[in-house]
Amino acid sequence: MRQRDIFWFWLPLFASWMLMTAEGPVISAAINRLPDEVIMLAAQGIVMGLAVMIESPIINILATSTALSKDWPTFRLIRRFTLHLALLLTVITALVSFTPLFDVIVGRWLGVAPEIARWVRPGLQIMLLWSAAIAWRRFLQGVMIRFNQTRNVAWGSVVRLIFSGGTVMALALLTDWPGIIIAATALMAGVIAEAGYATWAVRPQLRRELAPTNPPANGPVLTYRDLFWFHLPLALTSVLVLMLQPLVTSSLARLDNPTLNLAAWPLVFQVSLMIRAPGFALPEVVIALTNGVDNRRNLQRFTYTVALTITVIMAVFVLTPLSEFYLTQVQDAAPEVAGLAKTGLLFLLPLPGMTVLVAWLRGSLIAHKFTRTVNEGMFINLGVTAASLFLLGSLRWPGLIAAATALNLAIFIELLYLLWRVQQKLAFSFPWLNFVKARPTM
């Protein structure tokens, strides 16, 4: 497979991620132009942290669906599994947002100041169906990716951004609602619209490749138990990944200048998400295209190119006036918030490149059904992050610098671990990294 073939398969998925990550800055820009912008921005960061934490077990249904949706029986099985998980996560969201459990989590565990916490609850209540909408559309997107319909995934993100952006602008102009209420409503409008589009866009695959009249695919029959054990490590990996955001916000809430740090962190996080989007699109590309040594080498080369490219882009953004223009003019952040955010971005400079490398290794392991190893790597990442935040917080490091340093160190350690494991399990060759002799297990 040529580099251009990989590029054209990957490009719509990258575009989809870019559009999704652009949603956050659009929402933040609207909040920054409404009353009490610092409080509302801090509350929005916590709402999103909790929402994505609750949805985390279902995020990797995209990888599961891409890897396993091979015929009508497996499609039906994964659909049933997805609906079960969606129902469970909706119940959890209701318990957290509508019961006293909210005070325990937000007030006691996260240590969020009361003036911020009072706005977090209604925002989370509005997002009751967030996990269900995400679950349904990611399941269907996995089907589209498996059958080379990645453009439809990108168009779904266009629909989402149009609905969320249109809703936030309309409500900001036509109502006097608080910023967090407008933001949560806009986010829900976007994900529901995208789920609806995915339901419409997947119909050709249901009539052709996944038609009930088609003979079952070759290989062993997938059972609910098999599906559960395949997805469980991926679900745990997503849980661990998304625990990072509440972990960081909790640490920032306990350090000096908590309100400013919590207001700046969503801006830093959103920019880092946008720049890391090329890496987030890689796992499903690797899962779908891994087929033989030649493809593996071409995917490896493509990964290195993407990692180098986005590292350069991050450096240009952070080290030139572009970052100041974006934070102060586009986002209209207060000067003190923009200054903190720029410092945080500077310290996150190594993160995007390492994210791409880790995404490639995860995709390679998932393609060969070593999902537990992916989970182990993320567990290491979370452990290093937690330990680093605790240590740097004890040393009274500035909040965003401590958070950025912890994230960089954690993903670097995870990268080393995954490199070691793919050499063992998949006999990958890294001449520049000879700390272990490869021992194929397949």
List each language-model region with its residue ranges.
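Interhelical loop/hinge segments that connect adjacent transmembrane helices in multipass membrane
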Residues: 1-11, 116, 180-188, 193-242, ...
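Hydrophobic faces of transmembrane alpha-helices in multi-pass small-molecule transporters and flippases
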Residues: 2-22, 124-128, 154-158, 197, ...
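Transmembrane helix-bundle signature of multi-pass secondary active exporters and lipid flippases
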Residues: 11-63, 232-288, 313-314, 348-355
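Small-residue-rich hydrophobic transmembrane alpha-helices
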Residues: 43-94, 137-145, 264-317, 358-366
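Alpha-helical transmembrane segments of multi-pass membrane transporters/permeases
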Residues: 79, 143-170, 181, 292-307, ...
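Short membrane-interface helical motifs at transmembrane helix boundaries
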Residues: 91-121, 313-343
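Alpha-helical transmembrane segments of multi-pass membrane proteins
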Residues: 113-137, 270, 275, 335-361
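Hydrophobic alpha-helical transmembrane segments
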Residues: 123-125, 155-170, 174-207, 398-424
